[in-house]
């Protein structure tokens, strides 16, 4: 998809960019694969804010996505490429030979009419899902499982991909989109190809109102708060933060401070840490 730019007819339009949605083939989602989506506004079951800067936004319906890709041996044909308001990637509606319909994350270069397959015997072709142990070294993949049968959890955002680097016993070595190199069980499934809609990261929201449509609320700087609200708060005028390093609102060091557990169980699977 290409990026569309606007002329600076107003301060909000100046610099604003949007995707042209040229790859989208329909604006009518499959009703049987929709579910209601209640707004949480960043609150947990106690009503406490656990994720800041969320709330409002346009009403959405959830699209039920097939992350497991467990429909083995039954060919499916791509019916539509659709927009999904709940993720950065586009989604593809697949009509299977037995009559079932499922949504999958749309890989780059997947077109309407193409055929896809799942299972250990599937070809190494864009959109096909198979165990990592059956995928050749050097192949780009996405929607990777961490536990067989759980469904894809890694590399699902627009424009991302991971690469199979090697095989070692029952594990496959994969370089993730973050640059981290880790071992994943060979029985875990992945989908061949890169995630589509790679232009997503180039979009400039342009104005505050558009961010509110997306459910993003304002981010207030700690230095303009009161001391009771933030470690950076207080002072007369534009005061320095008065601390050795920047802090979170809860008094923890931030901007480069490592928060990962020192003895994380998954450390043994990580060969090289991600890039900063």
Curated annotation (Swiss-Prot):
GO terms for molecular function: rRNA binding; structural constituent of ribosome; transferase activity. GO terms for cellular component: large ribosomal subunit. Gene3D superfamilies: 2.30.30.30, Nucleic acid-binding proteins (2.40.50.140), Ribosomal protein L2, domain 3 (4.10.950.10). Residues 258-276 have a biased composition (Basic residues). Belongs to the universal ribosomal protein uL2 family. One of its GO terms (biological process) is cytoplasmic translation. One of the primary rRNA binding proteins. Required for association of the 30S and 50S subunits to form the 70S ribosome, for tRNA binding and peptide bond formation. It has been suggested to have peptidyltransferase activity; this is somewhat controversial. Makes several contacts with the 16S rRNA in the 70S ribosome. It comes from Geobacillus kaustophilus (strain HTA426). Part of the 50S ribosomal subunit. Forms a bridge to the 30S subunit in the 70S ribosome. This is Large ribosomal subunit protein uL2. PANTHER family: LARGE RIBOSOMAL SUBUNIT PROTEIN UL2M (PTHR13691:SF5), RIBOSOMAL PROTEIN L2 (PTHR13691). The lineage of its organism: Bacteria, Bacillati, Bacillota, Bacilli, Bacillales. Residues 224-276 are annotated as: Disordered. InterPro entries: NA-bd_OB-fold, Rib_uL2_dom2, Ribosomal_uL2, Ribosomal_uL2_bac/org-type, Ribosomal_uL2_C, Ribosomal_uL2_CS, Ribosomal_uL2_dom3, Ribosomal_uL2_RNA-bd_dom. Keywords: Ribonucleoprotein, Ribosomal protein, RNA-binding, rRNA-binding. It comes from the Bacteria.
């Amino acid at each position: 998809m290409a990026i569309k730019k606007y002329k600076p007819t107003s301060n909000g339009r100046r610099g604003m960019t949007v995707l042209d949605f040229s790859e989208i083939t329909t604006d009518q989602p499959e009703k049987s694969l929709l579910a209601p989506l209640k707004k949480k506004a960043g609150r947990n079951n106690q009503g406490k804010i656990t994720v800041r800067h969320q709330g409002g936004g346009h009403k959405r319906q959830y699209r039920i996505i097939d992350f497991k890709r467990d429909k083995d041996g039954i060919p499916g044909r791509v019916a539509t490429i659709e927009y999904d308001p709940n993720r950065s990637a586009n989604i593809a509606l697949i009509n299977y030979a037995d009559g079932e319909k499922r949504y999958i994350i749309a890989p780059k270069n997947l077109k309407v009419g193409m055929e896809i397959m799942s299972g250990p015997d599937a070809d190494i072709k864009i959109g096909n899902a198979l165990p990592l142990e059956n995928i050749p070294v050097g192949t780009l993949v996405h929607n990777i499982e961490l536990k067989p049968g759980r469904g894809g959890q890694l590399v699902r955002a627009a424009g991302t991909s991971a690469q199979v680097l090697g095989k070692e016993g029952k594990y496959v070595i994969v370089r993730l989109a973050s640059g981290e190199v880790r071992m994943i069980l060979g029985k875990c499934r992945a989908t061949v190809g890169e995630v589509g809609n790679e232009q997503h990261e180039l979009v400039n929201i342009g104005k505050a109102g558009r961010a509110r449509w997306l459910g993003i609320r304002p981010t207030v700087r700690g230095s303009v708060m009161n001391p009771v609200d933030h470690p950076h708060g207080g002072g007369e005028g534009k005061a320095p933060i008065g601390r050795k390093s920047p802090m979170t609102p809860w008094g923890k060091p931030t901007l480069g401070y490592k928060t990962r557990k020192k003895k994380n169980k998954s450390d043994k699977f990580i060969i090289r840490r991600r890039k900063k």
